[in-house]
Amino acid sequence: MPKPVVAIVGRPNVGKSTLFNRIVGNRVAIVEGEPGVTRDRLYQDAEWSGRSFTLVDTGGLDFKESDEIIQGVRRQAEIAIREADAVLLVVDAKAGLNPGDEEVASIIRRAEKPALLVANKVEKFDSLEQIYDFYRLGLGDPLPVSAAEGLNTGDLLDRLVEMLPPEKEDEYPPEAIKIAVIGRPNVGKSSLVNLILGEERVIVSNVPGTTRDAIDTPFEANGRHYVIIDTAGMRRKSRIDRPTEKYGVIRALRAIDRSDVVLVVLDAVEGVTDQDKRIAGYAHEAGKASVIVVNKWDLVEKDGHTMNRYTEKIREELAFMHYSPLLFTSAATGKRVGKIMELVDMVAGRHSMRISTPGLNALIREAVLRTPPPSDKGRRLKITYAVQGGIKPPKFVLFVNAPDLMHFSYLRYLENQIRAAFGFEGTPIRFVLRKKTKEA
């Protein structure tokens, strides 16, 4: 089920990023030391009162070009508001009403999206004259908060979850494998989808972002049900210019949330970009199975070592996705495109694979004997038992004497041992540590 998307919009320096960090800061688990994932905190999942949503911070997208402030705010807000399910308009109560605030508010009113007006930087809640001018924005009662101090943010979240659309399930058969095709504009996503489907169901043009929107295409192959979620409409050339291209991420987030398998499509000529890392990182953190598809391979000049060099470079840039199979393709020539669905089936199977508890514990014992767990000041970590606690992605619960002694590098070692013994290619693996209690 896709999470609703909430966009935080407003002119620069009103506290958007502070509010973003306040909402997600204590509700997002980030593994210390995990390499490679780009964490610019542009977007993050959050939860309140049992409702999950994806929060998007426009603070990192303020224009650094020579554009006027209001022009920059307009472009950011139009994209964020169009793609979001709900909007938080943040204004600066200290600075008072500003033409930039009025500009964003007018866009929200025209879009008819659920919106909450957040008057930030309110220090004294017994004297609120400073927020009265914001009623002129036509978005209802301004909610006074202090994002820096956390004041009234609980009330803000209560009102926000009331605005979110009702939860609903996808209408496809439960056994259908949902495949998200993600990547930057013009990397060849639609052409690859057309070849997979064997027919022209998706509009294709050489102009980035010509697909009208994210398109679901159910189909059957070899007796199995699939749904391809094509996000080729990440950017509309007539509406969005290059500085705001990052907002294609919002559609990718939705597609990833709904998917079982993610095809991360890269441009072989341009290589891995920051946006590629962001979107791939979200797929990894969401626990999805994945295949890295390097398209336009026909445009690369090659010698006998080219593929090895490219593989090494991509593995370095997307180190957090080290488990994903890598496929070099050309939608223009059809080379290796036929292998995509083979890999989809394979990684989907690994994503939902279970291994026996005796087999898992035997492997853990051997791994511990080969390389003992870390210790600290005479205390040594002991792993007494292990069990697989879930699938999609595979999750392993380790019962230990002292969870605080576990180091990320040792978990990576155990992950490598599990992968070597059982496979799990194409899927992330999660670990949960449980303290072993002494029996009475």
Swiss-Prot record:
GTP 2 binds at residues 183-190, 230-234, 295-298. It holds the Pfam family MMR_HSR1. CDD domains: EngA1, EngA2. GO terms for molecular function: ATP hydrolysis activity; GTP binding; ribosome binding. One of its GO terms (biological process) is ribosome biogenesis. Associates with the 50S ribosomal subunit. GTPase that plays an essential role in the late steps of ribosome biogenesis. This is GTPase Der. It comes from Pelotomaculum thermopropionicum (strain DSM 13744 / JCM 10971 / SI). The lineage of its organism: Bacteria, Bacillati, Bacillota, Clostridia, Eubacteriales. The gene is der.
